[in-house]
């Protein structure tokens, strides 16, 4: 299979097959195009996602292997279980999407900048208004302390980013997502790439072909209707 980088046309909402993605950098498939809801949804339904530095044009990726978590097999170690039991917090769904994505876009202490630009924020806010993008929020004493956001495609959730202002807040948010998603027939969480944080939670690396086959299968299967209704949830 030939591998090449495709320049996208702003007028055409189209992507090449992910099998053409470059091996180095791993998964880079296309460049350019807008961040319209139609293009973003077309990308995610083909296992493609945008990621680029703010000074770069939009870059589209489909890495091989793909990092995934099966929500019913999430690894919650003893230490994290104790933290969850002993830490007072409230959890909600879709109560503060804009605040979550804004917090995810804020510069981190461990990084020089952020990849979530203002156009990216506005694009996912639009997807949220259309019912495709969702958030999980962790609260303490009425203050938003951690959260994550992503897209739901049938029984698959495409995680995008997370943040935390408290110790282990991001892990608690991931546990909340997995348990809530599994209770509503969710079957797979796309984490895009392996990293040390996700390794502690049981991330698996699947060949891209396996991930795309599962995406095609799960993307047309419905969740329980109440999954993304705004409100509080419990672990």
Regions flagged by a language model, labelled:
Residues 1-235:
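N-acyltransferase acceptor-side catalytic subdomain
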């Amino acid at each position: 299979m030939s591998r090449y980088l495709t320049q996208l046309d702003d007028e055409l909402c189209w992507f090449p097959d992910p099998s053409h993605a470059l091996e180095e950098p791993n998964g880079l498939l296309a460049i350019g195009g807008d961040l319209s809801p139609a293009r973003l949804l077309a990308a995610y339904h083909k296992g493609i996602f945008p990621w680029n530095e703010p000074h770069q044009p939009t870059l589209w990726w489909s890495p091989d292997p793909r990092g995934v978590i099966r929500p019913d097999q999430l690894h919650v170690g003893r230490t994290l279980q104790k933290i969850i039991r002993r830490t007072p917090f409230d959890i909600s769904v879709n109560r503060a999407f804009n605040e979550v994505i804004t917090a995810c876009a804020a510069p981190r202490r461990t990084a020089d900048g952020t990849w979530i630009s203002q156009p990216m924020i506005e694009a996912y806010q639009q997807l949220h208004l259309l019912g495709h993008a969702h958030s999980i929020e962790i609260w303490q004493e009425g203050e938003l302390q951690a959260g994550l956001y992503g897209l739901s495609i049938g029984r698959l959730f495409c995680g995008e980013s997370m943040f935390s202002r408290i110790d282990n807040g991001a892990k608690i948010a991931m546990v909340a997502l997995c348990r809530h998603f599994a209770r509503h027939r969710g079957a797979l969480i796309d984490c895009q790439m392996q990293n040390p944080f996700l390794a502690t939670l049981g991330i698996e690396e699947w060949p891209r072909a396996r991930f795309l086959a599962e995406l095609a299968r799960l993307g047309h299967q419905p969740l329980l209707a109440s999954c993304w209704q705004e409100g509080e949830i419990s672990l």
